[in-house]
């Protein structure tokens, strides 16, 4: 099995939906989130996440992301601790991979 993963648009959108769904997850990841790690389509949303959290100490609402960044993201309902664990592991790997590109 290969250690190299591909992160398609669906995966990147899923990561953003997780971040939108749980402010605590975003707080834990905000120092490694960089817009350039994402496809061009999602960069305005990531920039908004970062700037909004710095200015307002909160993540933007789905409506704000849609209006300001032009990206429609739906929160993920019923996120569990197991989902958090998966997300944190996968997102850290994603950020490391993208930082080396």
Briefly describe each language-model feature range:
Residues 1-95:
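Noncatalytic partner-interaction/assembly domains of nucleic-acid and motor enzyme complexes
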């Amino acid at each position: 099995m290969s250690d190299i993963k591909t992160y398609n648009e669906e995966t990147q959108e899923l990561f953003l939906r997780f971040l939108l769904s749980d402010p605590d997850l975003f707080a834990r990841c905000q120092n490694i989130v960089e817009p350039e790690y994402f496809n061009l389509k999602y960069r305005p949303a990531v920039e908004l996440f970062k700037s909004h959290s710095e200015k307002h100490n909160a993540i933007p609402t789905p409506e704000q992301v849609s209006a300001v960044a032009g990206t429609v993201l739906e929160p993920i309902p019923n996120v569990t601790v197991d989902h958090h664990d998966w997300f944190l592991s996968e997102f850290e790997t994603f950020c490391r991979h993208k930082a080396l590109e």
